């Protein structure tokens, strides 16, 4: 994440609880996305004013997206207006192993940095993987 992240106001305890989000991982040729509702914003590793801004997500290892996380250095976390809840519900209930669920959900994938995101997102965090367990 860049320093622009620090210039905006967020409700770190509410953002994942009250808004719907999707993680997108991969590159233009092969990528996947899934609905995420467990996560947090925070900071780690650094002196005051120099810590790293972080997004922490919890993805079940059986999810197809988890395979992409293993092989990727970057990912995006995108937040959407409520009008996209039906599309996001589709992402959360269908597997990208079996279909192009992003297209079938009516969303538009776009390149963001070294990974992918969504044109329809109202806010997207471009993230670098720090740790995966």
Predicted segments — roles?
Residues 1-133:
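Active-site-proximal mixed secondary-structure blocks
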């Amino acid at each position: 994440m860049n320093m622009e992240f620090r210039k905006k106001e967020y409700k770190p305890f509410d953002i994942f609880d009250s808004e719907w989000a999707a993680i997108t991982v991969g590159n233009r040729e092969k990528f996947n996305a899934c609905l995420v509702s467990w996560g947090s914003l925070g900071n780690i590793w650094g002196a005051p004013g120099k810590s790293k801004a972080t997004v922490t997500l919890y993805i079940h290892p059986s999810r197809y997206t988890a395979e992409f996380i293993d092989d990727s250095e970057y990912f995006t976390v995108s937040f959407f207006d409520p009008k996209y809840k039906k599309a996001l519900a589709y992402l959360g209930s269908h597997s990208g192993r079996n279909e192009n669920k992003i297209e079938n959900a009516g969303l538009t994938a776009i390149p963001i940095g070294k990974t992918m995101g969504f044109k329809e997102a109202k806010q997207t965090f471009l993230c670098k993987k720090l740790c995966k367990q």
